[in-house]
Amino acid sequence: AMQTMADISSCSWGNFGMRDLSSEPRVALNNTSAYGNNVTKSYFNALYSVLTDSNTLGFAVANGTDFDNPDQIEMVSKLGQALSIGYLALVFDKVWISDETGAVVGAGLEGASSYKEAMTFALGKLDQAIAIAKSKNLSLSETAIPGGGGSNASLVQFMNSMGARMLVGNLRSSEEKASADWAKVLTYANAGLTNDFE
């Protein structure tokens, strides 16, 4: 449904809310609990599930749980926090932020933060994950990421590519585009992936 909403593809049916999200002129999103197309609900719930698991891992590391490789677990925790909060910020106007220390209360409704604040937080977590991976020369197993994508070099490049992608993807207006930190985007991109996946 998000592809049709972005005019990337089309569909002859209204499956998964495609018609509702992609009709033009745009119509208001049906945000009631009775709405049958759960395209945003499933996305929302899945990303908060990843965030909860990532926070639990981070909490365990911070409180001395015995792991074979606590640095690797901490890096995975920070990466999970970054990607879940970052991708929530790409889609929603408000994000409820939390990490291993608990809720990070924003000024919005029921403690929500704006998408800009959420992305700033997510990129901070991503930068922490990159720093841990680089300083500890961490990698992930072939089982976790097949095809060599879990090597330290590939992992660091992947995280940098995600930073560039999230930073640019979060721009929602011409004004935001004009004031974006393009130097940071370039720094991420230059340290990112240069090869394609097969």
Feature annotation, model-predicted:
Residues A1-N15:
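Acidic, glycine-rich segments characteristic of secretory precursors and extracytoplasmic regions
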Residues F16-E198:
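Structured, solvent-exposed acidic/aromatic patches
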